[in-house]
């Protein structure tokens, strides 16, 4: 048996086409063009690449997108002032501070300086609190877990009663992913580096989400026959003198037992960017008093 390889790129491309129509109609019907500002502090090459990809996607859709480039030496207080200026600019609907930031800057302070209505990453304490108290419809949800859930629902619509295991407990993926799965009436277990007998937990999973940041961590013997496996990891390794990206799952082996599995690259990554665009549209509509517009185009 080989699993169904779930192309996040193909699903994200379909979402992109839908969003382009939505944005075009939003302009015509409401004279509204969603605007995303990405704040990039320093010149980290990986961050620059991520930002370029986000901006390219936004422009393809017809969003207004700009990058605010700031030196790595900027003071924390100056960065906070820049964010306040964006918070107070009614033409800006989404603000994203590309992580990581330099060590002298308090990441959590910066995240919570962003107006929660413009926090398209979904990391502000207010958005986190709303998600964890069952108010998904009244907050901006982190993009990667949102993309993962959408992928899972392309495989099976009814998740109620499923056993789901999330490997990883980060604020960015693990915790919100568990929360979203709970919202679908799954029985959710979160495992992590201190979990005893971790493979035993994984073997119970109908849905297994790996977000641990360790190359090929999840082995064939850990996976239930017919499980859905979502691989969030993207790890750079060198193999036979060649650099490549691999996930947190041993794809070649686990693909033999899973009913569906996401590849790396081309799995979760494109979905993260697609849902950043989704959040930007939601933020723009909410700030403009336009409710339920995106839901006419995309089933969230």
Curated annotation (Swiss-Prot):
BP-aspect Gene Ontology terms = L-histidine biosynthetic process; methionine biosynthetic process; purine nucleotide biosynthetic process; tetrahydrofolate interconversion
Name the chemical reaction catalysed here: (6R)-5,10-methylene-5,6,7,8-tetrahydrofolate + NADP(+) = (6R)-5,10-methenyltetrahydrofolate + NADPH; (6R)-5,10-methenyltetrahydrofolate + H2O = (6R)-10-formyltetrahydrofolate + H(+)
Question: What SUPFAM superfamilies does UniProt report for this protein, alphabetically?
Answer: Aminoacid dehydrogenase-like, N-terminal domain (SSF53223), NAD(P)-binding Rossmann-fold domains (SSF51735)
One of the record's GO molecular function terms? methylenetetrahydrofolate dehydrogenase (NADP+) activity
Q: In which pathway does it act?
A: One-carbon metabolism; tetrahydrofolate interconversion
Q: InterPro entries this protein is in? A: Aminoacid_DH-like_N_sf, NAD(P)-bd_dom_sf, THF_DH/CycHdrlase, THF_DH/CycHdrlase_cat_dom, THF_DH/CycHdrlase_CS, THF_DH/CycHdrlase_NAD-bd_dom
Matches recorded under PROSITE patterns:
THF_DHG_CYH_1, THF_DHG_CYH_2
Q: Which PANTHER family does UniProt cross-reference here?
A: C-1-TETRAHYDROFOLATE SYNTHASE, CYTOPLASMIC (PTHR48099:SF5), C-1-TETRAHYDROFOLATE SYNTHASE, CYTOPLASMIC-RELATED (PTHR48099)
Subunit field text: Homodimer.
UniProt function note: Catalyzes the oxidation of 5,10-methylenetetrahydrofolate to 5,10-methenyltetrahydrofolate and then the hydrolysis of 5,10-methenyltetrahydrofolate to 10-formyltetrahydrofolate.
Q: What is this protein called?
A: Bifunctional protein FolD
State the organism of origin. Answer: Ehrlichia ruminantium (strain Gardel)
Q: Name the lineage.
A: Bacteria, Pseudomonadati, Pseudomonadota, Alphaproteobacteria, Rickettsiales
Q: What would be the name of the gene that encodes this protein?
A: folD
